Amino acid sequence: MLKKTHCLSLLAAAFFCSPIAGWVTAQAEEKNPVFEIRTYYANEGKLDALLARFRDHTVALFKKHGMTNIGYWVPVDNKENKLVYILAYPSHEARNKSFKAFSSDPAWQKAFKASTKDGRLVKKIVNEFLTGTDFSKIK
C-alpha cells in the first residue's frame, strides 16, 4: 500500500509532467521544434498587474494562436521584478506566424490597452531561442 506522501508525489508528478509529456509526444514527428525562453522585467510596482494579464488573458491567447505554454516562473528572490516563461513551437516559422496572429488579435489589443492604462507594465523583454540536445528529454 502506498503511503500518503507517495500518493501526493505521484499526483504532483502526473500534474506537472503531463503537459510536457503530451507536447513531446505530439512533436515527435516534427523535425526542428523551437523553444523560446522569455524574461520580462516589470516596471516597479507592476509585476502583479503583469502576472494578472498573463493569468487572465495572455496564456489563453498564446494557446489560441498555436503556442505551447511550457511554464511560467518568478525568481524566489525577485529583486528585479522578473517573469520568466518558456513557449514551444513546431518551427521558427510557426513561432513568427503565431506571434503575428497574437499581436493582431483584438482580444490581446483590448487586454493590453486595459492593463496599461496606468502605465506600461514591462520595461524590458529578453528572449532566447533554444533547441533540445540529443540527451534532453524535451527536444
Predicted features by range, described:
Residues M1-A12, I20-A21:
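Bacterial N-terminal signal peptides that target proteins for export
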Residues V24-A28:
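Boundary at the C-terminal end of the N-terminal hydrophobic targeting segment
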Residues E29-N32, A52-I70, Y89-L130:
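An amphipathic, aromatic/His-enriched active-site/gating alpha helix that lines ligand/cofactor pockets
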Residues E30-V34, D77-K79:
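Short, flexible turn/loop "capping" segments at secondary-structure junctions
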Residues F35-T39, V84:
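Active-site-flanking beta-strand signature of metal-NTP-handling nucleotidyl enzymes
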Residues A42-A52:
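Short, surface-exposed ligand-recognition loops at beta-strand->loop->(often short) alpha-helix junctions
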Residues W73-E80, D118-R120:
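A short beta-turn/loop motif at secondary-structure boundaries
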Residues T131-K139:
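Acidic/histidine-enriched, glycine/proline-rich intrinsically disordered or flexible terminal extensions
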